Amino acid sequence: MSIEGVLKEGFVTTTADKLINWTRTGSLWPMTFGLACCAVEMMHAGAARYDLDRFGVVFRPSPRQSDVMIVAGTLCNKMAPALRKVYDQMAEPRWVISMGSCANGGGYYHYSYSVVRGCDRIVPVDVYVPGCPPTAEALVYGVIQLQAKIRRTNTIARQ
């Protein structure tokens, strides 16, 4: 957290936006939407070697308890309404990480009649993680990029 000033009396001054965003970056609770082989790498990122828990990322089983959705894998046309329904059940503010070539743009199955050519056609995506499949390190980097994006956003609406 960048603190604008520390006074000699022991007070710390900052804005409410920066304080709220700093607390949000330390408690991201993702809802996993694993559709293909990228989900295996997502499990690696949550395991002991990479340990997303150290960033405050704790996987949740319910969309009502989540504020981040990680879409990992090929999204077909029949699964798209379910993806949107799960996204709509998440509380605000909510963010989406698109993980892998298939989730980003259809990947290997881009020209198939049954594949959505990117989950950004169904839900707004905040961070794209490239690769086929992307490594666990790439997902950790994507989470760090999402934390940086959250720190930059304005939380309190200004007139």
From Swiss-Prot:
Gene Ontology MF, one: 4 iron, 4 sulfur cluster binding
Tell me the Gene3D superfamilies matching this sequence.
3.40.50.12280
Main location group? membrane
Task: Give the UniProt record's GO annotations in the biological process aspect.
Answer: aerobic respiration; electron transport coupled proton transport
Q: Which UniProt keywords apply?
A: 4Fe-4S, Cell inner membrane, Cell membrane, Iron, Iron-sulfur, Membrane, Metal-binding, NAD, Quinone, Translocase, Transport, Ubiquinone
InterPro entries named in the record: NADH_UbQ_OxRdtase-like_20kDa, NADH_UQ_OxRdtase_20Kd_su
Q: Where does [4Fe-4S] cluster bind?
A: 37-38, 102, 132
| Record field: transmembrane | none
> Catalysed reaction(s)?
a quinone + NADH + 5 H(+)(in) = a quinol + NAD(+) + 4 H(+)(out)
How would you describe this protein's topology in the membrane?
Peripheral membrane protein
One Pfam entry for this protein is Oxidored_q6
Keyword hit for Transmembrane helix: no
* Coiled coil regions in record: none
Q: Where in the cell is it found?
A: Cell inner membrane
Question: Does Transcription appear among the keywords?
Answer: no
Q: What does this protein do?
A: NDH-1 shuttles electrons from NADH, via FMN and iron-sulfur (Fe-S) centers, to quinones in the respiratory chain. Couples the redox reaction to proton translocation (for every two electrons transferred, four hydrogen ions are translocated across the cytoplasmic membrane), and thus conserves the redox energy in a proton gradient.
The record's comment on protein family reads: Belongs to the complex I 20 kDa subunit family.
Task: Name it.
Answer: NADH-quinone oxidoreductase subunit B
